[in-house]
């Protein structure tokens, strides 16, 4: 199984649309570019392009059942101390996965083995964001139904 196949399996979300981001300016901390919603399923090929840095891919976490298998906290802080935040994440009793975002902040992912209601995912991530000191951060999924 390729890395793209693994990401395809891990990020299970809305299967009829996805986000795409084409970077056009890398001269600043936050890369400039064009984002758009594509009204078509995401594919392993799109994951390959994403992992190769050709085009950003955004999977909508909430599915048509108002459930999800993953969610994220979007911490948009330009002078973020990544090492300090990772240390905090390791102290929490929930397995979270941090990833640097294109803005220089961090996306903190929570994955589940089974589908959970989007409202429950949002509530859990909001609680974690507050515990981390980032209660005002954007939470995905954005909606609970």
Regions found by a protein language model. Name each.
Residues 1-70, 79-84:
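DNA replication initiation on ssDNA origins
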Residues 16-20, 94-98, 135-138:
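Short secondary-structure junctions
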Residues 17, 106-112:
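Broad hydrophobic/π-residue packing in well-ordered secondary structure
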Residues 55-86, 91-93, 112-145:
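DNA replication initiation modules
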Residues 98-107:
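Short, conserved phosphate-binding/catalytic loop or strand-edge motifs used
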């Amino acid at each position: 199984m390729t890395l793209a196949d693994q990401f395809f399996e891990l990020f299970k979300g809305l299967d009829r649309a996805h986000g795409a981001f084409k970077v056009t300016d890398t001269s600043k901390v936050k890369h400039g570019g064009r984002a758009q919603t594509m009204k078509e399923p995401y594919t392993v090929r799109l994951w390959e392009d994403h992992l190769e840095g050709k085009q950003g891919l955004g999977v909508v976490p909430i599915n048509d059942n108002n459930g999800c298998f993953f969610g994220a906290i979007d911490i948009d802080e330009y002078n973020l101390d990544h090492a300090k935040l990772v240390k905090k994440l390791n102290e929490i009793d929930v397995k979270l996965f941090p990833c640097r975002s294109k803005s220089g902040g961090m996306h903190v992912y929570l994955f589940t083995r089974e589908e959970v209601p989007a409202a429950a995912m949002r509530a859990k991530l909001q609680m974690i964001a507050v515990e981390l000191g980032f209660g005002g951060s954007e939470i995905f999924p954005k909606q609970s139904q």
